């Protein structure tokens, strides 16, 4: 399989939402953070729809997300990529690994793995299943990553058992695993840095190990603070976070920029959405980012 790779000279970032619902305040934070980080470096900002899991998708959500980004004047570069149209890329890589023994079939259930202590112990690597039906596919973890550097959080240490685990790259239901798809897509699109929410810190080690297995240079990572509700839960579609209002971008952008640590000018109330974003690109600094912040309805779904 041929992957395009990336040029070291040009910054390429991306925003990659899943279409399981409309954009909410937490996903706007990820969009703005990745946008500011790219544009502050005169870089490219891509949008990719991560529609890998049809049972979790909401009909029409992908189009709604793109319309909302446009309403917020977050204009992406290039063409929107849909993971649902890239299955051949993922399967070709899996087939290549299966042919060399780098990947293998596994029939272990969640119940069986729980009995192993919660981490898969390599059972099917030693005892291959007699049949391939109803099996997942795992990658041999020959390139373990136990630490990585995050631009905000510094050195992140990954538990040894997690770092050593042969992880799933294709599920037993036939769906491709998130870790495999995002790494292959980021390599193919030339992404140089991933900016996303801190809830995705955990799989980062596995994704870096995939870069090493593919003999590619890993991207750098910046994990943004999470927007939390009053109960300490992350704002997410699963937690029924309200959709942001596409008809009132200025107020919500202002609130989101304050969340990201900006001290806004006193005359910002008269600025257009385009002017606010341009100002943000000029003044963005990673050092301004706060820790997780509680979000009230005033931030996520209310008037200015």
Curated annotation (Swiss-Prot):
Its EC number is 6.1.1.-. A motif ('KMSKS' region) lies at residues 234-238. ATP binds at residue 237. Transmembrane segments: none annotated. One of its GO terms (biological process) is glutamyl-tRNA aminoacylation. Binds 1 zinc ion per subunit. It is an enzyme of class 6 (ligase). GO terms for cellular component: cytosol. It holds the Pfam family tRNA-synt_1c. GO terms for molecular function: ATP binding; glutamate-tRNA ligase activity; zinc ion binding. SUPFAM superfamilies: Nucleotidylyl transferase (SSF52374). The keyword Zinc applies. Its cofactor is Zn(2+). HAMAP family: Glu_Q_tRNA_synth. Belongs to the class-I aminoacyl-tRNA synthetase family. GluQ subfamily. This is Glutamyl-Q tRNA(Asp) synthetase. It comes from Vibrio cholerae serotype O1 (strain ATCC 39315 / El Tor Inaba N16961).
């Amino acid at each position: 399989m041929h992957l395009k790779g990336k040029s070291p000279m040009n910054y390429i970032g991306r925003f990659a939402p899943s279409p399981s619902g409309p954009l909410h305040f937490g996903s706007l934070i990820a969009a703005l953070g990745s946008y500011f980080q790219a544009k502050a470096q005169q870089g490219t900002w891509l949008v990719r729809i991560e529609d890998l899991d049809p049972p979790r998708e909401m009909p029409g959500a992908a189009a709604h997300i793109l319309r909302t980004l446009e309403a917020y004047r977050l204009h992406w570069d290039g063409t929107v990529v849909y993971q649902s149209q890239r299955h051949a890329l993922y399967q070709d890589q899996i087939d290549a690994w299966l042919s060399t023994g780098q990947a293998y079939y596994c029939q272990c259930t969640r119940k069986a793995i729980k009995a192993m202590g919660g981490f898969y112990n390599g059972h099917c690597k030693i005892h291959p299943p007699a049949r391939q039906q109803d099996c997942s596919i795992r990658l041999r973890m020959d390139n373990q990553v136990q630490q990585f550097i995050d631009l905000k959080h510094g050195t992140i240490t990954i538990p040894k058992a997690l770092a050593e685990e042969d992880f799933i790259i294709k599920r037993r239901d036939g769906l491709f695993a998130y870790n495999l798809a995002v790494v292959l897509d980021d390599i193919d699109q030339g992404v140089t840095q991933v900016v996303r929410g801190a809830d995705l810190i955990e799989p980062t080690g596995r994704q870096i190990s995939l870069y090493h297995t593919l003999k590619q240079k890993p991207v750098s990572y910046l994990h943004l603070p999470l927007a939390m509700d009053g109960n300490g839960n992350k704002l997410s579609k699963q937690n029924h976070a309200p959709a942001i209002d596409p008809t009132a971008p200025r107020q919500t952008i202002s609130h989101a920029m304050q969340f990201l640590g900006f001290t806004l000018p006193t005359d910002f109330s008269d600025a257009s959405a385009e002017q606010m974003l341009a100002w943000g690109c000029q003044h963005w600094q990673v050092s301004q980012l706060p820790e997780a912040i509680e979000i009230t309805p005033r931030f996520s779904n209310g008037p200015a």
